[in-house]
Amino acid sequence: MRIILLPQPHWLIGKEGRSEVESGEQRRTVFAILLAISFSHFLNDMMQSVIPSIYPLIKEKYGFTFGQIGAITFAFQMTSSVLQPFVGWYADRRPQPYSLSVGMLFTLLGIVLLSFANSFLLILLSVSVIGWGSSVFHPSASRVAQMAAGNRNGLAQSIFQVGGNGGSAIGPLLAAILVLPFGQHAIAWFALAAMLASATLFRVGVWYKRELHRFTKKAQVVNSRVAQFSHRKINIALALLVVLVFSKAFYMSSMTSYFTFFLIDKFGVTVRVSQLCLFAFLTAVAIGTVVGGHLGDRYGRKYIIWGSILGAAPFTLLLPYLNFPLTILTAIVIGLVISSAFSAILVYATELKPGRVGMVAGLFFGLSFGLGGIGSAFFGWLADHTSIEFIFHVSTLLPLLGVVAGFLPNIEPKRKVR
């Protein structure tokens, strides 16, 4: 029997004949996997965005208060957020390549339950099950994105996240077309998206299983980037990132959960028009995500984080005082600017804790979801006791916390990717 040794692909061979996967040098970005993960993220977040999109419908149908609306968001975002760091930690230690596909089945179940839920408690249960699916998806998918990134981590995370942002943007539009005219039962059609996502993620799992050993070697090499930092300095940097995630997540919760109500209350627009305006805002968020990741790779993530959150502050402060056309235009600018932060934050954090991509991604996705849920519940309570317009006078101050990004250490002050 003859054994034929096939040569390695040229992009894996270094200048001295070594595998560049082993040496940690240039690696190819696997765009096919990134696009598959991004597409799955698109479908996942499209289904999740149905939840806030139907708030006006279920508020009127069941007579819910703003506090109950906030509690629904809180239930979804807390179930997804609390589990994510643990799922990520487990994925780092014992990777399960097909967990992504299986986790999507939780989302499928939650969507079907939500389409038939006829009480506050059943709706809470439905969104919680969707949250469980999210807790499995985000940390593991973020880990796959880093595996496929090559040396372009910021771009890879942006491609992954833009799928989610695109899904969040298209979800309200589809809800306006399918759910609002035909009622709550029409939500069941979104189960088809869960089936497609599960099938796509199964194929990703095949690649994931094959590439695990290479990713482990890459993580060991990347660890040298932050070897100069003490544990105290790393922990302070992570704490600053948490503050930045808090400011972004709380502000975004006011927009995603209550921007439609704000437009209806202040300008008297219809529910359909308000959903289209939310779609415009979320589309801007999707575009800003890609731009932010690319710029972070080129010029350094610290500066993108700083400019993204603090740079949105002048526009958020103006928002409550403008007329309808300028309100929509300003909301689009806010979406473009503030959304460029998260991919930079996530990659910055994983560079501080290399080899723990799943745990770090789970922690920061979990924080983003959990703080968003707390913010939504808080602003719902505040709206019940004051007014929907008042919460937008309060939330506009949050991006000012972006000033703390100036205290982050410079990991890569300036970096260009050609």
Where are these regions (language model features)?
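Extracytoplasmic gate region of multi-pass secondary transporters
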Residues: 51-52, 235-286
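Helix-loop-helix hairpin linking two adjacent transmembrane segments in secondary transporters
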Residues: 160-209
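Flexible cytoplasmic inter-helical loops of multi-pass small-molecule transporters
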Residues: 190, 203-227, 416-418
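C-terminal transmembrane helical hairpin of 12-TM major facilitator-type secondary transporters
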Residues: 296-345
